[in-house]
């Protein structure tokens, strides 16, 4: 992966994504950049410009969990933002996608999140159940093809024996926990669709219940009830996914104590 892009490079990517040659970058603050991608919160000006937006850049060398490469992953993310909101999945508004050579970027509306309330996890569980109730036929052919080619997220330290058989595959977000679920005044907004694939729905629900440290029993139970109100779930696989997470956290505690 080449060096960190300068402001001129960021501005050029914004212009390509938004289709606005007169757009001018006023400021760009790093925001995340996990898994080898680069993300900035940007302030821009120019006729018709959105004012504040987010740019995410994909380059060779990023952690390509889905196996689609920079362009395929960015395209999948952009299409997911454009399509899923029409199916009851709240996402940031996609402002554009662009690629050049072996690099790609997407621009999206900035989402200002607030602290989670006691009911945020349950709300997120209901949205997750809606996602799991969708089928690839609900997606555009291009997005469905990218999703079907994606390797589902699965790797986790602490995986335990006794995995039950997988009864169904559904659309799977792949990284569904507080870091990618923004609480807003209008409800939640689900971020970061790089790992969207066909996989185990209980991976997602287990992630929501266990990937954040310190989720209490009442909060987790409320989330399970909210999910169950929308669709049935595999209790055996959910128990196994949660057991895997508990093994992971036990390992983390031991590691932190050293």
What are these regions (language model features)?
Residues 62, 115, 181, 198-200, ...:
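Conserved protein kinase catalytic core
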Residues 92-106, 110-171, 195-198:
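A cross-family kinase active-site recognition segment
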Residues 202-233, 245-258:
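Active-site activation/catalytic loop segments of kinase-like enzymes and analogous catalytic loops
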Residues 35-44, 49, 53-55, 161-203:
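Active-site acidic catalytic loop and adjacent metal/ATP-binding pocket
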Residues 51-98, 116-130:
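A conserved alpha-helical element in kinase catalytic cores
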């Amino acid at each position: 992966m080449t060096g960190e892009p300068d402001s001129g490079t960021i501005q050029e990517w914004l212009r390509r994504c938004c289709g606005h040659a007169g757009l001018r970058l006023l400021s760009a603050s790093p925001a995340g950049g996990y898994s080898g991608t680069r993300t900035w919160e940007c302030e821009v000006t120019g006729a018709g410009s959105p004012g504040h937006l987010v740019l995410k850049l994909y380059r060779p060398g990023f952690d390509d969990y889905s196996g689609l490469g920079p362009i395929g992953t960015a395209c999948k993310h952009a299409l997911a933002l454009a399509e899923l909101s029409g199916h009851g999945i709240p996402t940031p508004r996609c402002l554009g996608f662009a690629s050049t050579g072996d690099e790609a970027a997407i621009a999206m509306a900035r989402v200002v999140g607030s602290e989670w309330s006691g009911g945020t996890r349950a709300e997120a569980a209901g949205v997750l159940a809606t996602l799991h109730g969708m089928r690839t036929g609900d997606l555009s052919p291009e997005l469905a093809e990218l999703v079907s080619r994606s390797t589902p997220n699965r790797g986790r330290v602490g995986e335990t024996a006794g995995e039950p058989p997988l009864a169904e595959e559904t659309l799977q977000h792949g990284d569904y926990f507080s870091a990618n679920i923004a609480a807003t005044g209008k409800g939640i907004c689900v971020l970061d669709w790089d790992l969207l694939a066909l996989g185990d729905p209980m991976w997602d629900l287990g992630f929501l219940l266990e990937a954040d440290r310190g989720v209490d029993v009442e909060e987790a139970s409320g989330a399970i009830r909210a999910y169950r109100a929308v669709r049935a779930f595999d209790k055996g696989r959910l128990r196994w996914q949660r057991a895997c997470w508990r093994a992971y956290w036990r390992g983390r505690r031991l590691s932190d104590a050293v």
